[in-house]
């Protein structure tokens, strides 16, 4: 699934960037990235009607169902918006590390690594979500990711 591969790339690039600042930070970032996916399954996926199906745009539906039971009848939009912040550090800690590295220890390698992280995290993943994974999703009208303007007003 393209979404999972791009997320894996984001996590590895992010761990590389943070590890260049301080090796233990890179290791911690990698562990956090993996734990955040499990937390995503527990806090968000259990409330989704795609849990246990292959129709999940993220590709987590079947995998998350192996570890967590669904909670039917939940307000998916509210749950998603409340808990999605667990994923923010996966994007913004490596981004901050990349900016720091560019300012403190600029090199072409750091620039290329940072550029790859930015392209994957802020262009590729949103593009895959909007135009491939989420395009035909039956929960699109309930999902804050796909209906961000309306969802912000409703929550």
Can you name each region flagged by the protein language model?
Residues 1-36, 87-119:
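Long, highly hydrophobic alpha-helical transmembrane signal-anchor segments
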Residues 23-51, 120-129:
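Hydrophobic alpha-helical membrane-embedded segments
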Residues 53-63, 142-150:
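Membrane-cytosol interface motif
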Residues 106-148:
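Alpha-helical transmembrane segments and their immediate juxtamembrane interface regions
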Residues 155:
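Polar-ligand-bearing catalytic/cofactor-coordination segments
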Residues 56-82:
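Short membrane-interface loop/juxtamembrane segments of multi-pass integral membrane proteins
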